Amino acid sequence: MKEKNKHILVAMSGGVDSTVAAALLLAQGHQVSGVTMRVWDTEPLGDGREPAHIRDARKVAFDLGIPLHVVDLREEFLQQVVTPFCEEYLSGRTPNPCVLCNRVFKFSRLLREADRLGADALATGHYARIVEHDGLKVLAKGSNRQKDQSYFLFTLTQQQLQRVVFPLGEMSKEEVRTHAERLGLHVAQKGDSQDICFIPDGDYIGFLERQSHATDTEGSIVHVSGKRLGKHRGAYRFTVGQRRGLGIAWPEPLYVVAIDAAKKQVIVGEKEHLHVDRLVTTGTNWIVAQPQQPLQARCRIRYRHQEAPCTLVVLGNDRVEVRFDEPQSGVSPGQAAVFYDEDRVLGGGWIA
């Protein structure tokens, strides 16, 4: 978006990325407002006291000279992100709440907030780009491959892409920090968030037990051959691909290859049993036109996975079969599978 004097609402987390995104838009001559979501309080707060990320966002907004709007979404976030996250884990799947938050809140709820405030567009600090291809707005990888976040954005629609801006799409993290230092912003060296925002300590098991009242439901650890090898204290304590913490002896290293929550079984096997040559996605979203014929593409099955060559076959009812040229390991039901054509995101869905 190169036109001057646009009113752009920037989603601000109090971190360096969204702060620099706002600063860049200001430098381009846009009218900029900030918005911060209050979705989950991870620290005890006294009456009237705000979480640290909101305090940081208020300070950088003040430093930049822009208004900041705070939207309290705690109840909706509990219902639409946290509860599904817990339910997915307890059903034996490995959820990706960041993708869900992007779909439900950052690029839906905040676009409605932009409408309410009379803003023309919404900007975020994601490392991704929007490019033109065959007359469409298409999501593309950020220029800095180490920080590329396009994987988390596959649910964007054409309508949303018309109104979304990614100011950091051509930048590296080092360039972002240098720009923040040049502006004298106090968040210049603020650390990156490494965990799910509502589980900052990374203790998923403890969170599930506190939040969803998961109990130590005992079940069996079973080899792919059918041999029972031991017991566990809850299938939600395991994820596909896990090797450590199984607590069983076997001549060769064993990995979790599947979880059957209904039977309370954790199925384990040797490494070769992790390999699959195909998967099916549900809830598939196409950013480009849905292909009418099998399509050669590349598929990423987790954030740090190198996309693998594959053939996409549309099955109908938002389902797509992904047929890999070479078997892939660590395919976890509940995670996102995102389809690429070189740098461009074609779409993606949830691994069934």
Curated annotation (Swiss-Prot):
Q: Which Pfam families match?
A: tRNA_Me_trans, tRNA_Me_trans_C, tRNA_Me_trans_M
**Compartments, record wording:** Cytoplasm
Q: Which residues form the signal peptide?
A: none
- Output the GO biological process annotations, alphabetical, semicolon-separated: tRNA wobble position uridine thiolation
Q: What is this protein called?
A: tRNA-specific 2-thiouridylase MnmA
Which UniProt keywords are given for this protein, alphabetically ordered? ATP-binding, Cytoplasm, Disulfide bond, Nucleotide-binding, RNA-binding, Transferase, tRNA processing, tRNA-binding
Q: What is the lineage of its organism?
A: Bacteria, Pseudomonadati, Thermodesulfobacteriota, Desulfuromonadia, Desulfuromonadales
Question: Which stretches does the entry tag as region Interaction with tRNA?
Answer: 147-149, 302-303
Could you tell me which InterPro entries the record lists for this protein? MnmA-like (IPR004506), MnmA-like_C (IPR046885), MnmA-like_central (IPR046884), MnmA-like_central_sf (IPR023382), Rossmann-like_a/b/a_fold (IPR014729)
Biological function: Catalyzes the 2-thiolation of uridine at the wobble position (U34) of tRNA, leading to the formation of s(2)U34.
The EC number(s) given in the record are: 2.8.1.13
- Family according to the record: Belongs to the MnmA/TRMU family.
- Classify the main location: cytoplasm
Q: Where is this site: Interaction with tRNA?
A: 126, 335
CC terms in the record's Gene Ontology section: cytoplasm
Residues that hold ATP according to the record: 11-18, 37, 125
PANTHER family from the xrefs? Answer: MITOCHONDRIAL TRNA-SPECIFIC 2-THIOURIDYLASE 1, TRNA 5-METHYLAMINOMETHYL-2-THIOURIDYLATE -METHYLTRANSFERASE
